[in-house]
Amino acid sequence: MTRLTIFYILNWLGLTIYIVNTSLYLSHGEMGVFQIIMAVNTPLFLIITIKAFTKGISKLFKSDEHEFRYLASSLLVFTYIFTGIDAKVLAIYRDHFNIKLFGILFETGVMQDLGVRSSDLFSLGIQIFGICIWVWISLFVSNWVFENKRNKGSELTSQNIQIAFKILIYLSMVEKLLFSYFHYTDRERINGYWASIPSYTVLKMSKVWKPFIHTSPDSEREAAKITWNFENDFLLAQSQFKRNISNMTAEKTNVNIVFLVFESLRSDVKIPEIMPNLSRLSREWISSDRHFSNSNCTGNGTFGILTGMTPFYWYPSYKAEYQPTALTILDHLGYNIDVYTTTKLGYSDMNKHIFTDAVDNVYEFTGYGGGLGHPMVKRSDLYKWDEMMVDKFLTNFKSREPSTPSMSYLWFYSTHYNYYFPESFGKFKPYIDRHYQIYEPELQKESHLVFNRYKNSAFYADHLIGKITDAIKESGQSENTIIVILGDHGEEFNEFGRFAHSYSLKNVQSSTPFVMHLPGILQSNYKVTSHADIMPSIMDFMGVSIPNNQLFSGKSLLQYNEDLDFAIVQECEIKNRPKKFLIADSDWKLEFTLSKGKIEAGNLETILDKPISSIEGVDYTQITKELLKKAKKNLGHFSNSH
């Protein structure tokens, strides 16, 4: 026994109690045998790591481990704090806290969106103080036991402790190796365990397992290679477009364009009970029941709406700060481009590569920010800003100069977390009406109350849609106005263990309603549409002289091509090149990765997010190949050599 033995044991017990309880909650009270082993082993592995590091440093300085007790204490305090943060992140995203999530959570405005208050920070400070006190007490107790009780313990007991500790180390490594194998072979249920245990560390040993388990044939490896530089080819195409823009014309230059874009509006709210106006318009105008955003978060989704580009081209556009081709065209044609928003345009640097200099006027209704202590919480009246925005737009639309065509982009906030609406629109009851946090331990049990709150905000948003479309109709401008109604991305309410968005490619997060009024055109034959198809359809309708395929990688909904009846979605990224994508057709969804010059297939599911099952006569390998072939072709859209 050393001076720190009891110190490590006490903190192992403390971490075990917290991690096992948290894992039980995240698993909805149902833990498999292997998950219990993982949950119990996690705190042991953390303690072993801290002890090994502290002992290694002490040996480096030729000193006793006890001399570095404050280093061990600091590491333990950090471990407790990180484990607590990781538990909250798991409750929201079902993934462990990492660099990507750090970028998402600390993007400008996100903490305000989450409703973080000064009292929440004060509570966090109290918890950290409590952790420090506990670690200090455990250190004090360990030192006291060593000073006063060590002589009362037999040498045999001390040896038994050492033997037991070594056995636990071996068992810990066996568990880690087993999970590494299960993780590599993509055992879905076992991977679900990983997403329910805070601070669980995976030993990533793909290079060890790959030679024994998965040996791809040469033809498969060759097919996966990307032999062209699609990003450079895209940039060259943009340069060519800039040279040709001066000679570009359009058949229709007097048609107005109105975008009604709603934060976090998921596809299944387009029903008469929740959004009667939108449901009615979907039967009268072009619509799609399988419409996908470019991504599951705002920046990437908005990129698709205004650029007409599929997700492969977000990163090069973002890095080069390219103005959307469609906005350049409209600007060239003399359009007055106005943006009305209740969201800051600087979010995800959208003011640099989406809402660029082509925009003539920006009407911001974002005066609700009052710092962390501001009551921008669940019972706030942020919906009033959407009302003010609509009134301003209608005033401008009715008084605009008829000879100057306009594009108006209205961006609504009411349907964003925390979901805002007047009390008179509280149709769906009961709904949550207290201050709540998205990472609360008990919120999963109240997900139906949160969802009702969301449906009320969608019901209110539908009222605004009716107000705008009715006003345009009454003004006599309907047959001269393109109207597009959609969400920037979807929103999850614990259907797959998560809340909100940004971290899953399931339909609830990546699919949105889509309704578009193109005067004289009632329908499209496409079964699957995406944000990237909107601008190509508008430019096709206007009769732009440059062919669509030279301008966009999305498709025009006016020109049916069976080979293009699909949508591509990317993972949420704020500043980095995305690696994970999804392609969806009318029946299937395939996740795939694009990295290091290779495109490789991942999980295949039905279009309804159901796992595939063995059905006689269904060739899943062929389905995967066909979907991957379509994705690869779109990847080479601007590459002449491909």
For the regions a protein language model found, what residue spans apply to each?
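Transmembrane and membrane-interface helices of multi-pass
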Residues: 1-205
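Membrane-interface soluble catalytic domains
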Residues: 5-9, 66-67, 139, 143-148, ...
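Short, solvent-exposed loop/turn segments at secondary-structure junctions
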Residues: 15, 262-267, 296, 310-312, ...
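Active-site-proximal alpha/beta segments of enzymes that process anionic O-linked groups
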Residues: 170-437, 554-557
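A short beta-strand-to-alpha-helix junction
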Residues: 317-324, 448-460, 504-510, 521-537, ...
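Histidine-centered active-site microenvironments of extracellular/periplasmic hydrolases
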Residues: 473-520
